[in-house]
């Protein structure tokens, strides 16, 4: 179950939300959890500099039916971003985020982006930022089928992107992106040698360099599609190995089809991953969403995840036959009211 209330007034916006889930397994056990949170942000224009600043807070709680103590966690962040026009063709973004997660501490994450117009409907950009990802509460405190790791730390590191984007026509958009990342304490899934159960651990180092290419096309007022591909070389060092080892996947393909007619819209998205480690089979994940505008203020949306109900391994296979699977086909019905 999910509920959200959002308020917007000119340059200020705020929201409160709640989410409740019940994960059932192929045994007699299941996992329950809920999240509640809020965020607020505002925009200002001081001279020629645009400033966006805000804060957010979230409380997470989870418990399973096998006697594990319930786990709960608070997290929050404050952030700002400035936007400055430098000359007629250059725009600079400069910002930072101070993020805090209980059990993981806090990290200061700066960001710098430069956007340069190099021609009609064509630009290049440079983006450098530091990121932080705290472990999911279930990754740290376990589930009915997974060991807990209270010492699991948040991962953090630097990300670098150099991109090019060109609007070929009013209906065609082409993007090229080259990226590199260096992550400390990267969170990954492994198998415990004693119990045979899965457990999440921290890798000492993680690095990944790759390229992404995407194309978007509007066929008509009703139909559109997008295509994308990626090639990367993700590697990590663990506590048990001082050598760089392959991880995750090398090749990725994605595609989407969109339809829009009057008050109705529909989209199907597909992601395919191959070139994986340990003989893990390719993964195909297809999601769909449908939307209907009931009135000018009311919208009904249906989202279906894992449309084909595949049980492909999503992440963390140490043998090629085990790991975190795609969730079973599930759906979310959303009603939105503007007032």
Predicted features by range, described:
Residues 9-11, 18-22, 46-48, 57-63, ...:
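Transmembrane beta-strands of outer-membrane beta-barrel pores
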Residues 1-4, 33-41, 73-79, 93, ...:
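Transmembrane beta-barrel architecture of outer-membrane proteins
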Residues 1-8, 117, 123, 127-184, ...:
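Outer-membrane beta-barrel signature, preferentially recognizing the C-terminal barrel domain
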Residues 3-9, 38-44, 80-84, 112-116, ...:
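Residues on the lipid-exposed face of transmembrane beta-strands in outer-membrane beta-barrel proteins
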Residues 85-92, 179-182, 201-277, 296, ...:
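Gram-negative outer-membrane beta-barrel transporters
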Residues 82, 126, 246-339:
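Conserved C-terminal beta-signal and adjacent last beta-strands/turns
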